[in-house]
């Protein structure tokens, strides 16, 4: 997917706008990352199921929602990628808070940098 070209079509930096633009494009059958509207809801359910002092809580999610937080991607390994208006979060499937990777980039800019190998993640696959 050409994220740089996609960026030119986005009217704003909202994660929901980004997700809708991605979903309007053809998806690869064997992609390492799955974009979906349902992933956010699944993420919240997993937060409830795995609730502990060390994991992401519903309260954390509610706080992030104030900044338009939305989970937009799940990897083949079950890890998540989410964004707010100004940050991108790479969240392990374990949901451990201490393992979350935070990047001060909007989702589209994160994907451009990731595709160009300008970002290193211990959680995500090395290549899209």
Task: Go through each PLM region and give its residues.
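Compact, glycine/acidic-enriched structural inserts
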Residues: 93-125
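Short, compact, well-ordered microdomains
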Residues: 74, 79-80, 84-106
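A surface-exposed partner-binding patch
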Residues: 1-80, 124-127
